[in-house]
From Swiss-Prot:
Gene this chain is encoded by: rplQ
Gene3D superfamilies to which the protein is assigned, alphabetical: Ribosomal protein L17
Keyword terms: Ribonucleoprotein, Ribosomal protein
UniProt-listed HAMAP family: Ribosomal_bL17 (MF_01368)
Pfam families associated with the record: Ribosomal_L17
GO-annotated cellular components: cytosolic large ribosomal subunit
Keyword Ribonucleoprotein: yes
Sequence ranges of Low complexity compositional bias: 143-153
Any single GO BP term: translation
PANTHER family: LARGE RIBOSOMAL SUBUNIT PROTEIN BL17M (PTHR14413:SF16), RIBOSOMAL PROTEIN L17 (PTHR14413)
Family label: Belongs to the bacterial ribosomal protein bL17 family.
Source species of the chain: Salinispora arenicola (strain CNS-205)
Record region (Disordered): 127-190
InterPro entries xrefs: Ribosomal_bL17, Ribosomal_bL17_CS, Ribosomal_bL17_sf
UniProt name for this protein: Large ribosomal subunit protein bL17
Length: 190
């Protein structure tokens, strides 16, 4: 257990510091990484690592000790069932502090504290976006390829028209407009 700091505490009183660190730990376990001041990140690191070590034990007493600090039961569940098993063969060093630039406004030194191995739910968000782009490009290629390589129709269907939807659009026009809407949405997000 780290020795308590002497002198001024974060937030004024020891009770306020304890509550602030508990809230920071809750946010860290919930989101995988948080941005805060360097001082708060340095003070949070030992607490977060102790809580992960207790969660690795997995027994009821450890769960109750963690619940005494982290009041959100959903976050405790995530800590015990998702975060702790990832660190089963790691002895400490569960967090990383990366210094960022000074904060605009008061020039306080800022840092990002994050769990060393990314959370599983943070990864698919980026993959969905790239997968959507690839799918849109693939659809665009498929839409262009049949028009170039399609053999001329033979037989009595030469006078047949393209299928028309209820709104009066052809399916090709509808596909082009859907692609344009998706591209516009992606540009607005970026």
């Amino acid at each position: 257990m780290p020795t308590p700091t002497k002198g001024a505490r974060l937030g004024g009183s020891p009770a306020h510091e304890r509550l602030m660190l508990a809230n920071l730990a809750t946010s860290l376990f919930q989101h995988g990484k948080i941005q805060t001041t360097e001082t708060k990140a340095r003070r949070l690191r030992p607490l977060a690592e102790q809580l992960i070590t207790k969660a690795k034990r997995g027994d009821l007493a450890s769960r109750r000790r963690v619940l005494a600090v982290v009041k959100d039961k959903d976050v405790v569940y995530t800590l015990f069932d998702q975060i702790a098993p990832r660190y089963a063969n790691r002895n400490g060093g569960y967090t990383r502090i990366v210094k960022t630039g000074p904060r605009k406004g008061d020039a306080a030194p800022m840092a990002i504290i994050e769990l060393v191995e990314e959370l599983a739910d943070a990864q698919p968000k980026a993959n969905k976006k790239t997968a959507a782009r690839k799918a849109a490009q693939q659809d665009k290629v498929e839409a262009l390829a049949p028009a170039d390589e399609a053999p001329a129709p033979t037989g009595g269907d030469q006078d047949a028209e393209a299928p028309v939807s209820v709104s009066g659009d052809t399916t090709a026009a509808r596909a082009d407009s859907d692609l344009a809407i998706e591209e516009n949405n992606e540009q607005n997000k970026a």
